Amino acid sequence: MQTKPFRIGTRGSPLALAQAYETRSRLMAAHGLPEEMFEIVVLSTKGDRITDRALSEIGGKGLFTEELENQLLSGELDIAVHSSKDMPTVLPEGLHLSAFLPREDMRDAFIGRTAPKLLELPQGAVVGSASLRRQALIRRLRPDLNVIVFRGLVDTRLRKLEEGQADATLLAFAGLKRLGKDNVPTEILDPKEFPPAPAQGAIGVESRIGDARMDKLLAPINDRPTYDAVTCERAFLAALDGSCRTPIAGYATCEGDNLHFSGLILTPDGQTSHGVEISGNRRDALILGKKAGEEVRAKAGSNFFEGWS
């Protein structure tokens, strides 16, 4: 019988903590356990400490996970909770994403200070975003806009916007909802026009491979449609060697046993893009994602990827 609390690792941002608390609540409900059986362990990551540069300049997605993963591997943590879109496609040996909570809204939210919609911004307006994908998609739709790097916590970005450092910014709608800021967006962007990052809106739980105790703990909270969709999306990313250095979008939807995936790769200026659509059985999620990545890579040609990293 478990006597020590389960140790849940997380970053310390308000959004990361909200995700850890949601994971804890679901585990408590699934197993009938009291709150004191779970300890939230907050760690600062390199990605949290460096906020003045784009992730693509300082090392990519692993900046938000390394400290948590080191403590998982050493046994100091039992599980780690992540925003799945921040996870590298290759995890450290001995670790895996073993569960995904039911996915929140995957779409991007537009927050306009001088216009309520992206297409209504005046010519030359300034839009702040740290995401290469969002920057490329903005330039694809509105090449006249001035896109600048906007990093920091959600509240920091919203404060920068209020201070007039930009006319608009974009954030994941899921994160805003988890922070109780559903009313902040002035427009929710259609994923067909403005596709999200792979795994956006999904909370992922990382654990040690072969840890039967944690597998048993996490099994009841794993949402299978989310697991299959994110598996497909991450396979697409992996086939393209995707990281924070590359403008890649893609999302899968599940209906019954069927899965449909839509993916897009862009040049950083947004002026050249290649899309892919694929459908199949959900049990083949990994294969479908990999196939979609290989298909779009072949369509784009090797020259398309030169100079990205």
Curated annotation (Swiss-Prot):
GO cellular component: cytoplasm
Free-text remark on how the cofactor is bound: Binds 1 dipyrromethane group covalently.
Named cofactor requirement(s): dipyrromethane
The keyword Transferase is annotated on this UniProt entry: yes
This protein's record includes keyword Transferase: yes
PROSITE patterns reported for this sequence: PORPHOBILINOGEN_DEAM
Pathway terms, separated by semicolons: Porphyrin-containing compound metabolism; protoporphyrin-IX biosynthesis; coproporphyrinogen-III from 5-aminolevulinate: step 2/4
An annotated Gene Ontology molecular function: hydroxymethylbilane synthase activity
S-(dipyrrolylmethanemethyl)cysteine: modified positions: C244
InterPro entries documented for this protein: HemC, Porphobilin_deaminase_cofac_BS, Porphobilin_deaminase_N, Porphobilinogen_deaminase_C, Porphobilinogen_deaminase_C_sf
EC number annotated for this UniProt entry: 2.5.1.61
Catalytic activity: 4 porphobilinogen + H2O = hydroxymethylbilane + 4 NH4(+)
Keywords tagged on the record: Porphyrin biosynthesis, Transferase
A GO biological-process term: protoporphyrinogen IX biosynthetic process
Broadest EC class assigned to this enzyme: transferase
Subunit composition and interactions: Monomer.
Note: The porphobilinogen subunits are added to the dipyrromethane group.
Record-stated family: Belongs to the HMBS family.
Role noted for this protein: Tetrapolymerization of the monopyrrole PBG into the hydroxymethylbilane pre-uroporphyrinogen in several discrete steps.
Protein's recorded name: Porphobilinogen deaminase
Organism listed in the record: Agrobacterium fabrum (strain C58 / ATCC 33970)
